[in-house]
């Protein structure tokens, strides 16, 4: 899995006509974020495919998972308060990104959303160790749901992360996929793909 850093641009000429229309329908601050994120995505993908940003067949309306045209691979997008992550693969892929120091009610999340096996493994932990372990599993679960093109509301309770954190299984669909965690600066990220070979082929772009 290869990783690169790229900063968002500001030149709206790199956007598609459809993206310009979508941006015009958003509040000003959200429109700026939308334009910059789509320009950045196009820049990352153009660099990967060796084409211009305008040639990238990207469909990424506000609030919806981004898609590439058939034959261009699969992508997944995640963002937190101060960073964005884009993943590309020849096979379906999902990513999730969070600040490594994010504070949240770890005990409550485990009790409400995690499987019985996960609760048994985690609820004896306390403090910072519990927070880190829950964050890692939450990242993998969200990445897996994006890989699935599912939803948190419908699928979160079905995804169980392995003790080694190297795979996740959907209990309702009887599907098992590969996962990988990484640290990058102030952030923690997870990638979910069909199998371990797809992990090797995956490309990441962080901004």
Language-model-detected regions and their locations in the chain:
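Core catalytic alpha/beta fold that binds nucleotide/phospho-ligands
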Residues: 1-207
